[in-house]
Amino acid sequence: MLGIVKMEGHETTDWSNYYQDTQEAYSSVPVSNMTQGLASMNTYMTMNPMSSSSNMTAGSFNMSYANSGLGAGLSPSGMSGMGAGSASAMNGMGSGVSSMGTALSPSSMNAMSAQQASINSLSYSGMNPGMSPMAYGPSNMNRTRDTKTFRRSYPHAKPPYSYISLITMAIQQAPSKMLTLSEIYQWIMDLFLYYRQNQQRWQNSIRHSLSFNDCFVKVARSPDKPGKGSYWTLHPDSGNMFENGCYLRRQKRFKCEKQQGGKGSQDGRKDVSGPSSPLHRVHGKSSQMDSSSSMSNPSSSPQSLEHNGSNGEMKPQVAAGPSPLSSHQNHSTHSLAHETHIHLKGDPHYSFNHPFSINNLMSSSEQQHKLDFKAYEQALQQYSSYSGGLPGMPLGSPSMAGRGSIEPSALEPTYYQGVYSRPVLNTS
């Protein structure tokens, strides 16, 4: 509007400078030439087909200039020259506007209307279900909920009580505080509808619960109450296993003290019959072997046993003559030690301090030296592949065969240090 006001303030000669484009220059728009301007605008609008949105924008932009020019032409300054021929000029203007209206009619906008129709045709119903997530909404909302038929209703559901809880409830509600097995079954079936089916399964569980729990005690029938089956009642020392009347979970487990006492007495008897003296506790296996050897030896006197028993030490004396059993044990011990030493290929100078070591089990020093030389021979055979053997001293030489003439310094680890790149004693 400010531009229009400024254009009205200037003279008609300055308007040619304001509009630089020759096609849109409507500076001299008298009333007599208004029809020619509108006709040129009509031809300009009809020459540009409105097949796209860009052409439509250009047409609307040119139409706005036409309206501004039209408004300027109809201003009071431009109307001053209007005379008797104003009616004919206005008729020409009306025809020009009508032609412009026909140019802007839907018949000339077929391309744009077709494009708009194609855009409007892209509804959610025609889209891919992955592109229109709301397409499934109405179908889900309009679906009627299916009425499901449950297998059993709520009263037929399994009760949240254990079998011990059911038995305890049945016994506690009885006037005599004891019931037979059939009465317990009947009470459970009357109270809970779930247990009216599959009776074979849960009745077996009831019997197992009665038999393997110390809180239930079987009471024999009295002569004044004939019938079948014994009575079951709660143990008098069981107390209140279900605190605050809550049978959902048993708070404490009852164990009969009499059975525990019987087990403890049996364990005590086993301890008494077992070895009790310090000698047996320290030398358990050796004392048993010595006692067995003394029992097998008939020459041992009972007086010596009584004398040793009075001193508080159980040391059975063995006769001076060696028994066949003891000699057999010594022979087996030596053979076992010999086999063990063959399998062990470690450092022969490493000594074990415990009493069952190989060095302590070997009786003679000669056997010890033989085993040491055997270990060295195995070590030399193992490392002969790396060094190619000693120069001038093969393994089968007489000097190597004479094991008794080897100096004691040869037994030291530093003796072979200059000969081999690796120490001989570390065979593992």
Swiss-Prot record:
PROSITE patterns: FORK_HEAD_1, FORK_HEAD_2, FORK_HEAD_3. GO terms for cellular component: nucleus. InterPro entries: Fork-head_N, Fork_head_dom, Forkhead_box_C, FOX_domain-containing, TF_fork_head_CS_1, TF_fork_head_CS_2, WH-like_DNA-bd_sf, WH_DNA-bd_sf. Residues 257-337 are annotated as: Disordered. The keyword Nucleotide-binding does not apply. It comes from the Eukaryota. Probable transcription factor. This is Forkhead box protein A1. It comes from Xenopus tropicalis (Western clawed frog).
